[in-house]
């Protein structure tokens, strides 16, 4: 059981490191569709019609 937890944590850490490294590169096409403002980096999971990315922070409401 402990080994399973350690392996899961290791996979999560490696995945986070890959996303951090990929943040310096251009967004893949499938990630561009998740953010309403794909020009900002660091908001790869802004979802919903009112969500947007300003200053690399995801906001629930953005004035137009």
Curated annotation (Swiss-Prot):
Annotated disulfide bonds: 43-53, 46-58, 52-62
Phylogenetic lineage: Eukaryota, Metazoa, Spiralia, Lophotrochozoa, Mollusca
Tissue: Expressed by the venom duct.
A GO cellular component annotation in the UniProt record: extracellular region
Keyword Secreted: yes
The record's account of how the chain is modified after translation: Five different peptides have been sequenced after total venom examination by HPLC-MS. cal6.4a-4c are identical in length but are differentially hydroxylated and brominated.
Family under the similarity heading: Belongs to the conotoxin O1 superfamily.
Modified residues (4-hydroxyproline): 49
Keyword terms: Bromination, Disulfide bond, Hydroxylation, Ion channel impairing toxin, Knottin, Neurotoxin, Secreted, Signal, Toxin
GO-annotated molecular function: ion channel regulator activity; toxin activity
Propeptide: 23-64
Top-level taxon in the UniProt lineage: Eukaryota
Chief site of localization: secreted
Purpose of the protein: Probable neurotoxin with unknown target. Possibly targets ion channels.
Signal peptide per UniProt: 1-22
Subcellular compartments: Secreted
Coiled coil (residue ranges): none
Residues recorded as bearing 6'-bromotryptophan in the entry: 44
Keyword set includes Signal: yes
Record text about domains: The presence of a 'disulfide through disulfide knot' structurally defines this protein as a knottin. The cysteine framework is VI/VII (C-C-CC-C-C).
Protein name in the entry: Conotoxin cal6.4a
